[in-house]
Amino acid sequence: MPHSSLHPSIPCPRGHGAQKAALVLLSACLVTLWGLGEPPEHTLRYLVLHLASLQLGLLLNGVCSLAEELRHIHSRYRGSYWRTVRACLGCPLRRGALLLLSIYFYYSLPNAVGPPFTWMLALLGLSQALNILLGLKGLAPAEISAVCEKGNFNVAHGLAWSYYIGYLRLILPELQARIRTYNQHYNNLLRGAVSQRLYILLPLDCGVPDNLSMADPNIRFLDKLPQQTGDHAGIKDRVYSNSIYELLENGQRAGTCVLEYATPLQTLFAMSQYSQAGFSREDRLEQAKLFCRTLEDILADAPESQNNCRLIAYQEPADDSSFSLSQEVLRHLRQEEKEEVTVGSLKTSAVPSTSTMSQEPELLISGMEKPLPLRTDFS
């Protein structure tokens, strides 16, 4: 199954499975209609009638929605009736053209025995009214999720962009300089490429304690990087601080890195605790996964995040107490160290040997007393 590179449980964006299934359904229906042996005119007439009823049903549903939206025309649509109509009916010209075209074909085809068009129109209006009053026209949860993802309407989308714009975009460009300054004063404690990055923890259950040592005693606070300050949103000399942690293994230091949680996950957890937010545990898990995927996509295209930031997404097993956050972080650090060594060896092997290229050119002189002419075919 397709999933994000961060974690197997993080889904990839939806593809075109629904469209492919619709093509299969279309083929099956065409074969069924062909096998029934009905006259083509008869089949076409009922098909056009059905399409016309669908368009008319959508139109009637939009008219009912328009009655409510007109009450908010100034607050939601800046007093524009055209915007209000488009919000409820889509493009009125397109929908009206489809409706008129369907009605034209309905009356132009040979008539068959059936209920009058006026009776069918009244029945269609009745069914749409019942759908609205009884709440039968709601979308399925999967459809709502697909619409929100496609339109970037999710809570996770806004949180991920807020986290990047309001925090990561500001601190990542200066991170390497702050680490170099720290190393100058503390004997290169953060040496190596993997130690000179910001590692962001992404627990999918949104469990974000304020103290990392509470999550794992083998993660121990060591020091802080030099603070970064700046004026933002009217706040003078706003301070940005990052913490350095040492990772213990068998009681010994096994790694050192700049480590922290993604604070928006704490917001998601808090939202699920407030009934006013209408945010269930399942919603929290879905939004946490979408937050991780969106943040990964943002950082993949952000030049300031190149080699400056790494995401560590994980999910603690509910029935397994052997999970160790420090070991999870160490696993990522060691994996990156291996990748750094592999990339370095490939670059070294790609450079041609300089043992012969760097030598001084030598002038080779023949031992003959007289130089030979340019032509050697003389007799």
Curated annotation (Swiss-Prot):
Outcome of F153A? Answer: Partially constitutively active mutant that promotes the production of type I interferon in absence of cGAMP ligand
Q: What is its main location?
A: endoplasmic reticulum
Q: Which organism is it from?
A: Homo sapiens
Gene this protein is translated from: STING1
Q: Which disease is it linked to?
A: STING-associated vasculopathy, infantile-onset: An autoinflammatory disease characterized by early-onset systemic inflammation and cutaneous vasculopathy, resulting in severe skin lesions. Violaceous, scaling lesions of fingers, toes, nose, cheeks and ears progress to acral necrosis in most of the patients. Some patients have severe interstitial lung disease.
Q: Which residues lie on this side of the membrane: Lumenal?
A: 35-44, 107-116
Give the protein's recorded name: Stimulator of interferon genes protein
Its biological purpose is as follows: Facilitator of innate immune signaling that acts as a sensor of cytosolic DNA from bacteria and viruses and promotes the production of type I interferon (IFN-alpha and IFN-beta). Innate immune response is triggered in response to non-CpG double-stranded DNA from viruses and bacteria delivered to the cytoplasm. Acts by binding cyclic dinucleotides: recognizes and binds cyclic di-GMP (c-di-GMP), a second messenger produced by bacteria, cyclic UMP-AMP (2',3'-cUAMP), and cyclic GMP-AMP (cGAMP), a messenger produced by CGAS in response to DNA virus in the cytosol.
Q: After translation, how is this protein modified?
A: Phosphorylation by TBK1 leads to activation and production of IFN-beta. Following cyclic nucleotide (c-di-GMP or cGAMP)-binding, activation and translocation from the endoplasmic reticulum, STING1 is phosphorylated by TBK1 at Ser-366 in the pLxIS motif. The phosphorylated pLxIS motif constitutes an IRF3-binding motif, leading to recruitment of the transcription factor IRF3 to induce type-I interferons and other cytokines. The phosphorylated pLxIS motif facilitates SENP2 recruitment during late phase of viral infection. Phosphorylated on tyrosine residues upon MHC-II aggregation.
Effect on the protein of changing L30A: Reduced homooligomerization and activation in presence of coumpond C53
Mutating G367A: effect? Does not affect ability to activate IRF3
Instruction: Name the family the entry cites.
Output: Belongs to the STING family.
> Localized where?
Endoplasmic reticulum membrane; Cytoplasm, Perinuclear region; Endoplasmic reticulum-Golgi intermediate compartment membrane; Golgi apparatus membrane
- What chemistry does it catalyse, as a reaction equation? H(+)(in) = H(+)(out)
Outcome of altering S162A?
A: Slight decrease in c-di-GMP-binding. Renders the enzyme sensitive to 5,6-dimethylxanthenone 4-acetic acid (DMXAA) drug, leading to activation of the STING1 pathway
Position of the Glycyl lysine isopeptide (Lys-Gly) (interchain with G-Cter in ubiquitin) cross-link: K20, K150, K236
Q: Where is this region: C-terminal tail (CTT)?
A: 340-379
Q: Where is this region: Disordered?
A: 341-370
Q: Which GO terms describe its biological process?
A: activation of innate immune response; antiviral innate immune response; autophagosome assembly; cellular response to exogenous dsRNA; cellular response to interferon-beta; cGAS/STING signaling pathway; cytoplasmic pattern recognition receptor signaling pathway; defense response to virus
GO cellular-component term (any): Golgi membrane
Q: Where is this region: Mediates interaction with ZDHHC1 and ZDHHC11?
A: 1-190
> Mutating L374A leads to what result?
Abolished ability to activate IRF3 and induce the production of type I interferon
Residue numbers of Phosphoserine PTMs:
S241, S355, S358, S366
Topological relation to the membrane, as annotated = Multi-pass membrane protein
**Per UniProt, what does mutating H232R do?**
Activated by both 2'-3' linked cGAMP and 3'-3' linked cGAMP
Recorded consequence of changing G158 to S/V: Partially constitutively active mutant that promotes the production of type I interferon in absence of cGAMP ligand
